[in-house]
Amino acid sequence: AERRLDLKFVISYDSDIRSARKAVQEIAKKNPYVLPEREITVNVDELADSSVVLVVKFWAKKENYWQARYTMLEDIKYGFDEAGIRIPYPQMDVHLESGT
């Protein structure tokens, strides 16, 4: 039996979406738990407040679900690091007004 995985991850607005999509496609193709005969898609899922949310959808054997999930998440992080694709973290700008 097979199971589809949908993994969401974020990139910064100043990162190139095409480069991120290409990197994730290549990472998925190299992952031994991802079924190569099934379609792998990477799409923009949301334009959030401080990031672009991407989703990768791929298939794995049911018994390899967790290995596929964990290895893909780790490989995406390392792949983004190597490609210079930034994963943003929440931040807040505080503006102080002087009292008059």
Stretches with model-predicted labels:
Residues 1-100:
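Structured, soluble regulatory/oligomerization domains located on the cytosolic or IMS-facing side
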